[in-house]
């Protein structure tokens, strides 16, 4: 026990007590601490006061209207209403001259520096009216601009840094696709494996432990893969998946790429910021404050990355990506808008608006940037609509949920719809005046899907326990015609091949699948994958993957099937999370060249079959060599174990009273056979 400071002890009679000396906590002489205060107290030091506190919260707004006392309050109200959208305003100061006229600029203080920065990004070069465009800067920028040297010195040339080949994955001679497999290696650690789908066995390209904290996502053309971390997200690319850029946005839950991969949108937790980034430079282009509701995929992109749009209250906000300002500096007013969607090939927006008093519901096609309404369709007794574009942009289908009558609930004032039936409004986008055809179905609609390449579409309708699958075709100048109706199918989802023609009818509750060729509607094969919850085609339409993720307790893993329904590989993987094929960019060949290749495809059959035979022969040889090597290893292992067993024979006999038990079973005279009968159950049957 250590002595207490200031406590006295009697030297006489205290000999029987043993007190330890107080330990010395001082650093030894010459000790140098290699850990900085920033590493130990980083979070605490962020709160340390500094000289710029208060100044960083202030912005300077130039080019505001010069007004007198009579119009000052109106100007004050306009500016406060405008800037409070960026954050909490603490104070506003308007410098005035001797006649109480404003001087054309103002100082605004916000609650924190983040709000001030948001105000600068949102309102710098903001057009207040025809004569005034606001110029907004941080007050702390004055020092930065005043320190600019008067004499310019040219920058020093930097050595050239070799860039990654981001497109090497599409140069594979046999067009074998890549895929990644995500699994949880340990709690809080996610492993990502990258594979090449070679035949007959896939080849592992790379494995990254702790590559991401949640999941990964491919960009639309397969150039990048994004990983999620506490501080933000990182994109990777190239043959070895090296880091390309990072985007700091704490707590990012979801990301979205623009179709041409020029921009990345990061979505923070609900109620927080949404940021649009330039992928190549890593700079922030524009940020928005979420309204607190679910904001996943709040922004929707045009096919060419020229525009991005989001839905507001009775309006569509369309931004030009060259400046990220509103198109024509104003929103598109649409009273009662419920949803909208871009065409996948043209700058056309399809939106629908709900019924309002005597006005019917309406579907409208809007051409951007001229904002011309190129087609309208009025709809009556509408409960809901779903917009489905065909991938080639040739057709648009609007699924309309209609009712015979409605009833308002007295308790919660909700409207209940009775006598439901369904219409499919088919817009022929490539024909003059965009004619519209209608297909009516009385039964409940469970699923709808367009053929990506072609003019067919499929629907699942009826009772989920015994549904029907109907296939229709939309031809130019004709109404949609039913091609085939498959009855009594237990399926819930439709998955078309990206190349068209083939479709998978899936029941994700039971894990059963049917592979259908829609040329003659033959069911090529049926199969099961117990508890499978995911289905994904590869980009070429040759393979299908079904997977069971961590949502179920056992049987995690994935199966690879051919497009004909033949199962090629079963992989059981503990803590399997996700399987993702790597997307491919669209072909550079023209439509005429593709038609020519299809026409002369028979010329290449012999070449393809020869390559397949060589590949299978090589694979068979490698497989035989692998088996022979494994057999040699087993024989070597068995020989060692037999030798050890023989060496231990003397010891075994000592333990067993010098009885050689190794040969007991070999001599039948040493074996006694005993038959034991056990009464399991006794039943009594009365005979009449």
From Swiss-Prot:
It is found in: Cytoplasm. Residues 9-32 have a biased composition (Acidic residues). It holds the Pfam family eIF2A. This is Eukaryotic translation initiation factor 3 subunit B. RNA-binding component of the eukaryotic translation initiation factor 3 (eIF-3) complex, which is involved in protein synthesis of a specialized repertoire of mRNAs and, together with other initiation factors, stimulates binding of mRNA and methionyl-tRNAi to the 40S ribosome. The eIF-3 complex specifically targets and initiates translation of a subset of mRNAs involved in cell proliferation. Residues 613-642 form a coiled coil. The gene is eIF3-S9. Component of the eukaryotic translation initiation factor 3 (eIF-3) complex. One of its GO terms (molecular function) is translation initiation factor activity.
């Amino acid at each position: 026990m250590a002595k207490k400071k200031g406590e006295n002890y009697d030297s006489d009679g205290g000999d029987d007590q043993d007190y330890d000396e107080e330990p010395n906590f001082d650093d030894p002489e010459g000790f140098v601490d290699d850990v900085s205060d920033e590493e130990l107290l980083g979070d605490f030091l962020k709160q340390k006061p500094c000289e710029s506190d208060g100044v960083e919260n202030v912005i300077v707004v130039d080019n505001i209207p010069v007004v007198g006392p009579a119009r000052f309050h109106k100007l004050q109200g306009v500016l406060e209403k405008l800037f409070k959208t960026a954050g909490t305003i603490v104070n506003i100061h308007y410098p005035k001259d001797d006649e109480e006229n404003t001087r054309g600029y103002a100082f605004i203080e916000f609650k924190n520096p983040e709000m001030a920065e948001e105000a600068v990004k949102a309102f710098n070069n903001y057009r207040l009216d025809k004569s005034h465009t606001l110029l907004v800067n941080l007050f702390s920028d004055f020092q930065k601009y005043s320190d600019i040297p008067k004499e310019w010195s040219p920058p020093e040339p930097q050595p050239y840094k070799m860039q990654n080949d981001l497109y090497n994955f599409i140069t594979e001679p046999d067009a074998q696709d890549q895929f990644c497999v995500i699994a949880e290696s340990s709690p809080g650690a996610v492993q990502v494996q990258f594979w090449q789908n070679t035949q007959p066995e896939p080849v592992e390209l790379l494995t990254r432990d702790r590559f991401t904290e949640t999941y990964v996502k491919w960009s639309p053309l397969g150039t990048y893969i994004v990983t999620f971390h506490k501080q933000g997200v990182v994109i990777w690319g190239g043959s070895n998946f090296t880091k390309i850029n990072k985007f700091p946005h704490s707590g990012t839950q979801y990301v979205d790429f623009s179709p041409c991969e020029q921009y990345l949108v990061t979505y923070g937790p609900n109620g927080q910021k949404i940021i649009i980034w330039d992928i190549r430079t890593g700079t922030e282009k524009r940020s928005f404050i979420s309204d607190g509701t679910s904001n996943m995929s709040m922004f929707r992109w045009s096919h060419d990355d020229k525009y991005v749009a989001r839905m507001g209250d009775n309006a569509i906000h369309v931004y030009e990506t060259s400046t990220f300002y509103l198109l024509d500096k104003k929103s598109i007013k649409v009273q009662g808008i419920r949803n909208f969607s871009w065409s996948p090939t043209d700058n056309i927006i399809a939106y629908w608006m709900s019924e309002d008093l005597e006005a019917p519901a309406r579907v409208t096609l809007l051409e951007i940037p001229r904002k011309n309404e190129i087609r309208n369709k009025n709809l009556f007794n509408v409960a809901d609509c779903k917009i489905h574009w065909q991938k080639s942009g040739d057709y648009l289908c609007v699924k309309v949920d209609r009712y015979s009558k409605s009833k308002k609930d007295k308790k919660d004032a909700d409207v209940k719809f009775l006598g439901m039936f369904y219409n499919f409004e088919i817009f022929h986008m490539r024909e003059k005046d965009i004619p519209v055809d209608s297909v009516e179905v009385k039964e409940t609609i469970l699923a709808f899907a367009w053929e990506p390449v072609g003019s067919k579409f499929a629907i699942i309708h009826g009772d989920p326990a015994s549904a029907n699958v109907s296939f229709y075709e939309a031809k130019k100048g004709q109404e949609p015609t039913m091609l085939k109706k498959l009855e009594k199918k237990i399926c819930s989802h439709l998955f078309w091949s990206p190349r068209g023609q083939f479709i998978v009818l899936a029941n994700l509750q039971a894990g059963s699948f049917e592979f259908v060729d829609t040329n003659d509607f033959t069911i090529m094969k049926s199969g099961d994958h117990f508890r499978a919850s995911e289905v994904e085609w590869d980009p070429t339409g040759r393979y299908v993957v079904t997977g069971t993720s961590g949502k179920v307790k056992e049987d995690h893993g994935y199966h690879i099937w051919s497009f004909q329904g033949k199962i090629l590989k079963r992989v059981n993987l503990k803590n399997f999370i996700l399987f993702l094929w790597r997307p491919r960019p669209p072909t550079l060949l023209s439509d005429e060249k593709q038609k020519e290749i299809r026409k002369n495809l028979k010329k290449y059959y012999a070449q393809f079959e020869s390559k397949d035979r060589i590949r299978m022969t090589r694979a068979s040889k490698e497989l035989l060599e692998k088996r022979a090597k494994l057999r040699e290893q087993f024989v070597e292992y068995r020989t060692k174990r037999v030798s050890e067993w023989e060496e231990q024979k003397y010891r075994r006999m000592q333990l067993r009273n010098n009885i050689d038990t190794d040969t007991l079973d070999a001599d039948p005279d040493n074996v006694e056979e005993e038959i034991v009968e056990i009464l399991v159950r006794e039943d009594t049957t009365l005979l009449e």
